[in-house]
Amino acid sequence: MNQQLGDHYAVTESADFLLLSNLEARPATVVLQTCQRMLARIRRNLGALAVEQGMGKHVVIVFADDDDYYAYVSNYYPEGGEYAMSSGMFIRAGYGHFVVPLAIMDAMEPVIAHELTHCLLQHLPIPAWLNEGLAVNTEHTMFPQLAMPSAQKYFQHEIPARHAAYWNADSIQTFWSGKSFLATDDGNALSYDLAKKITALAAGDEPAFRAFVAEASMDDGGVAAAQHLGYPLERLVQAVLGEGDWSPKPERWRRDVERGQF
């Protein structure tokens, strides 16, 4: 990989990370220190849910520009599709690693927190909505300014109407399957918003929520929720969207699900 990117990319390392980038020594050290600091915090937050896999250190790739970044991540999407833009991605294929395009450190920090959360949850077969909900809420816990109304894509008064216009009995199935997180329309942002909200609601009873996360599966259609949370998944969506046919129907998408980790 280093050879393919060219001589201006180099590997630097810390106690728990290997970083491939074109950064000078000092900026590379700052990135690694940031990764180490966030790893400690996220481990504390996730507790026993965070199980680290692999034969060694976490691998982080910081690409010099967006072109290099998208050229790389395109290898992990099906050919011929159109997908939402992204600022980082955890890639589970092969030796799990996460990738980000180079930006100012203030912009990279929350992306690193988000993708590192995915990294620490990679052993769990959880659905995309839960994977992303946990990652976004972890990111917002560490960087609360990102949860402020001024940092959102839409004005607060617009969000309920946009949800109401987008979600119905059919489109909600793309949320449960994870496909809506890859949408190039409003479905992308609305999926993340819905995921973070219903994940936060489910986490209200922390012991029950942790048991749910440990047992949830991409295609169980809410079995783990009924068992550990004590209510069906659609009740969480109902609390955000109001009345509707929100129940997951895994028979419609069980063979075509996304893990999250976007």
Language model: regions and residue ranges:
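N-terminal low-complexity, Pro/Thr/Ser-rich intrinsically disordered segments
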Residues: 1-4
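Juxtacatalytic substrate-recognition/specificity segment
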Residues: 6-127, 144, 221-228
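Acidic/His/Gly-enriched intrinsically disordered linker/tail segments
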Residues: 79-96, 107, 125-262
